[in-house]
Amino acid sequence: MELGSDDFLPPPECPVFEPSWAEFRDPLGYIAKIRPIAEKSGICKIRPPADWQPPFAVEVDNFRFTPRIQRLNELEAQTRVKLNYLDQIAKFWEIQGSSLKIPNVERRILDLYSLSKIVVEEGGYETICKDRRWARVAQRLNYPPGKNIGSLLRSHYERIVYPYEMYQSGANLVQCNTRPFDNEEKDKEYKPHSIPLRQSVQPSKFNSYGRRAKRLQPDPEPTEEDIEKNPELKKLQIYGAGPKMMGLGLMAKDKTLRKKDKEGPECPPTVVVKEELGGDVKMESTSPKTFLEGKEELSHSPEPCTKMTMRLRRNHSNAQFIESYVCRMCSRGDEDDKLLLCDGCDDNYHIFCLLPPLPEIPKGVWRCPKCVMAECKRPPEAFGFEQATREYTLQSFGEMADSFKADYFNMPVHMVPTELVEKEFWRLVNSIEEDVTVEYGADIHSKEFGSGFPVSDSKRHLTPEEEEYATSGWNLNVMPVLEQSVLCHINADISGMKVPWLYVGMVFSAFCWHIEDHWSYSINYLHWGEPKTWYGVPSLAAEHLEEVMKKLTPELFDSQPDLLHQLVTLMNPNTLMSHGVPVVRTNQCAGEFVITFPRAYHSGFNQGYNFAEAVNFCTADWLPAGRQCIEHYRRLRRYCVFSHEELICKMAACPEKLDLNLAAAVHKEMFIMVQEERRLRKALLEKGITEAEREAFELLPDDERQCIKCKTTCFLSALACYDCPDGLVCLSHINDLCKCSSSRQYLRYRYTLDELPAMLHKLKVRAESFDTWANKVRVALEVEDGRKRSLEELRALESEARERRFPNSELLQRLKNCLSEAEACVSRALGLVSGQEAGPDRVAGLQMTLAELRDFLGQMNNLPCAMHQIGDVKGILEQVEAYQTEAREALVSQPSSPGLLQSLLERGQQLGVEVPEAQQLQRQVEQARWLDEVKRTLAPSARRGTLAIMRGLLVAGASVAPSPAVDKAQAELQELLTIAERWEEKAHLCLEARQKHPPATLEAIIHEAENIPVHLPNIQSLKEALAKARAWIADVDEIQNGDHYPCLDDLEGLVAVGRDLPVGLEELRQLELQVLTAHSWREKASKTFLKKNSCYTLLEVLCPCADAGSDSTKRSRWMEKELGLYKSDTELLGLSAQDLRDPGSVIVAFKEGEQKEKEGILQLRRTNSAKPSPLALLTTASSTASICVCGQVPAGVGALQCDLCQDWFHGRCVTVPRLLSSQRSSLPSSPLLAWWEWDTKFLCPLCMRSRRPRLETILALLVALQRLPVRLPEGEALQCLTERAISWQGRARQVLASEEVTALLGRLAELRQRLQAESKPEESLAYPSDGGEGTGNMPKVQGLLENGDSVTSPEKVATEEGSGKRDLELLSSILPQLSGPVLELPEATRAPLEELMMEGDLLEVTLDENHSIWQLLQAGQPPDLKRVQTLLELEKAERHGSRTRGRALERRRRRKVDRGGEPDDPAREELEPKRVRSSGPEAEEVQEEEELEEETGGEVPPVPFPNSGSPSIQEDQDGLEPVLEAGSDTSAPFSTLTSRLLMSCPQQPSLQQL
């Protein structure tokens, strides 16, 4: 978008007012207040208070309207004159059958109107040609010099303008006695001037608002068309700026030529206006010679652009027609072949008689000069805004408006500066080259569509907030009918004046220069949307503005004198200001008011999409302007909206209802009106008209009582005729009624001349009633007659002013102030009297001083009204003065009795007046009271006061009257307070110090502070802390000197209490050390027993399983522990916290727990043994039984049965044993066929709750426990567990040492040796030949089987994978060869072994006897091939996962190397998950031993398998009983247990050194 280069200079801003809430409550009063300032500018802006925000009350969904169409360059007066001229000249050429194109000169369209005006101003065409001043014409048209533009302008003028100007002058018309044209009739009523055919072009329903800025495009090829038959082509096509320039791209199609000579030239002469590049324009003609004398010769062009084609008349064969063909110019009929017949009037003209003469016979339609002139002078159609064809809602109009603005300015609507829109608006309205069309929803009736303000009616219920705005004076529905407004006396709802109009605007939509009807005020409120830009001219410059506009555009005002009243004409404010018209501007934003004053011209446009509401109102100061407006309308013969006389008379008929200022203004106006009416009726009598009749004009419609001459609405009187009943005139135009005789005319009147003065008198009484009242008030307030009026009389005067609605004058304000002051005095005097009666209990602070009492009495005497309360006040003053004298005497006589002073003080309080001596009395009394309080506080027998009391006494002492006794008491109080604060601070430091002081120091501080007679809170706190410390020490001594070592819980409680005490305690450090040692031991024990991330506590593991008998209970408890939901019960043995302190009770409870555990496991084994196996469950389709800790349905292959509880578990959910772990660790030389030594024993996680350390590991914990002076529940549980394990070990050794079992063990040894000896010849069978290596593979495989988990480098990864695979293949291959049992176990032997096996599996300790019994039981039954097969499958799956993880680790290592980082150790990465996933007792034992080695420094030696001949087994078994029975002494079990452990491990001499 390219904006114009002509800058618009904004006019100065109009006044802006921001009323306060007090001013805002009276709208018309505030407007009257600002009128002296704002009226000088014509318009002003008012910003309401910030919180005045009326709700928008329009029903948006139902609001539909049809806007007006506005073509911007039709609005501006000067632009419209140019476009009208272009219409006329285009019409001139069109009616002659020729087409016209507006040429471009210097890349801009030629302004033909300005060219014509300048030629006239320079002296005319002939003068300019004679003086060769065409260059000056080009200069005045702002063309650059030196480009021969003057010649171009002359050519264009000669071809286009000059013929039109000659026709307009009428120089070549025949002067004949023809009937005059219609427009020459005298007193013809002019129609409003406008642009022809504009309203015949309906706007398009689509794309109606596109900016047509680039319309000056290359000229289209001329199109031959029958213009007469095609009505569309008769319309004018635009090539310039606006819809008023006619379409100039068509040529008339040749019709039948009316020539006598068929041999005439085929191509008529043509005037050509041709546009060339660079603005160089030439005029060419197809004729070889020019047809205008004295003109320059022109070049020729074979391609004309503009043609004027004419034709000859028809050749008729009848002779009588030939005789009638006479030229209208020369009156001759010769050379009839040169005669032309006009298509309009059939007159004949010689082609050489025309001006200018035609060299040849023209073609097409031709009209004579007379017809051309008549057509050009035809009055145009009325100008006005067209209505759009589309109906909008607010939403659809807003979308259209925002879209138009955003597209036009190529930016979001809210980002377009208002200055840019303003400049662009005035550029567009002044341009004839661009045509922008917008729509404006103007003058929408709020009565029909609803107001934007809330309205109190019955249509809908209003909220309290809406009700407030509905009654506000600033509501535009309320303001016109306010009491001070004149329009409230008009009954009719005048739309636009009394009833608001609504305006929905879009960018560039404008309202033209105008003043309000009857020169009234107007107020406009912008509800929401983008700003509205206003321009205003004050009323003093209204006539100047009209003169300037008439001077600049006389063509418009000659035909329409009231053009400015039609709201269709703009003129640039800069143009007006350049001619001396004062103009102001403002941007009205949402929520702001704009007020225009009487006869203030205003105009403006909208910055974008918005919604405004406007209405008129009239105040008392408007009445003179309204009367002048009627006279102005009478001169312009404009219709009135209402009758001004009727309004005045209607207000005069009820003067009591008028505001006083309004009554005075109406009286003045009516006086002038009555005088004028007397003069006019007198003139009527002088004319001889005496007939009259009364007429109630207010009952007649306005159109029936309008003067037929000046259109004024009559009310007081009118002149009518009996013979011409259809019309009447006002008395100012009595000569214009009709031609009838005066005797037939009569006066129609509303009031007689006697009635009018009566009405005037009532107004005068109303207006002058204020003066009468004011005189009464003045006499009363000034006491001019020497008599004070009573209070009632003054109130009556004030009531009269209120009832008669007198104005708020200074005198009324004085009266109100006097009444207010008098009533205040009466009320105060009554309060003074009632205060004396109430006595000293009245409210403090209401007493007046003696000086105030004297002033009050003087104030009452000075008031202009009489009050009987003055005597009461005088009596009170006398009493106060007498009391003052007595008080002075009492104060002078020292020392006075305190009782006397107190009684005087109480008497003074009853007076109700503050006497200065009373304050001295009060100070003396307060001094005595303070000294007494200090004496009581410091007395030895008194209760000790607090520091706050001491400080309060010091503060109170500073305000009492000074005396030596007071000074001494203050000194004693200050000294005592200083000492007390010093000791309080010392105690505070002791309580808050980081380094705690010993009890002795605190005792010394407390002892010294006891001598201070003040209550010290910190010293008291120190006493309490010291008492708690002594009690704590006593508790420590008691617990340390008891029969047993103290429990850890007790010590922890004492430590917690001791740490909180602000006393340094030596015993606390000892207790903290003991607690720390106990915690360290418990942590070591936890590491020894508990698995990583175990869900069991140490105490739970060491104690017997309390819920071993219930499978569901165990499973649910295990699941809750895994989820972190289950919290273990500390009373695992069924003992309370107090019972746990007795070692004997703990041992007995542990024994009972063992028995319950055995019974429970037997019951559980019976229950689980009755369960079907997972394979059996698979065969039953409807089975929903669940197994394992996961609680899922059986998984088939991969399920294992626990050897202790006999329940089933998924191999993927639990840790499973490795088949060859025992082969590799303990018996590496045994052959694989010794299947009873395979590690196939499986204990579920519910049965194997801990790591199950060996006894030698437990021995170190017991030795450390024996050194602890603290008792732990875990320690005693460990002791009991060890006793239980040793007891089971003794019984197991006894059974293993029996002859039968010893023989069975020997048989197994022989069988193992025989299998070892037979293994070498079978190596070739076990491993088939591979690559030529037959028997050499077995040692390699055996080595791999022995060291399968020892991969330590990346090079061995592939080897390990191969060996692992071979291990599994080898085991799978030998399964069919397994057979058994290899031993025969008698039932007498098997039963004790199974019982021992079960009891040993319950122990959370690892014992070698357990393994020996397991091998015997395994060898005595067939091999469990199903379990072996399951273990093989699980191990295959695990190894496959290990290979996958290994490859991933290797890829990660390689990527790290590629990035330049240090590669990870693949062996370490591979072993880490294996150690985590390793299972079985051996794996856990390895992990356990590694951790224990870290704790003990690697001094844990291995314990060999005990032989059957151990002499200590029976001794250990026998020595256990006395230990279990003598549980009362804690030292005995520890010493005995340690010695028995040493006997159980005879090859560990180093244990004695522990």
From Swiss-Prot:
Protein's gene: Kdm5c
Protein name stated in the entry: Lysine-specific demethylase 5C
Positions contributing to Fe cation binding: H514, D517, H602
Signal peptide positions on this chain: none
A biological process from GO: rhythmic process
Subcellular location: Nucleus
Species, as recorded: Mus musculus (Mouse)
Domain ARID residues, every copy: 79-169
Start and end residues of each stretch annotated as Disordered: 197-227, 284-303, 1319-1364, 1437-1535
Annotated Basic residues bias: 1442-1457
Biased composition regions of type Basic and acidic residues, renumbered to the chain: 1458-1475
InterPro entries: ARID_dom, ARID_dom_sf, JmjC_dom, JmjN, KDM5_C-hel, Lys_sp_deMease-like_dom, Zinc_finger_PHD-type_CS, Znf_C5HC2
CC terms in the record's Gene Ontology section: cytoplasm; nucleus
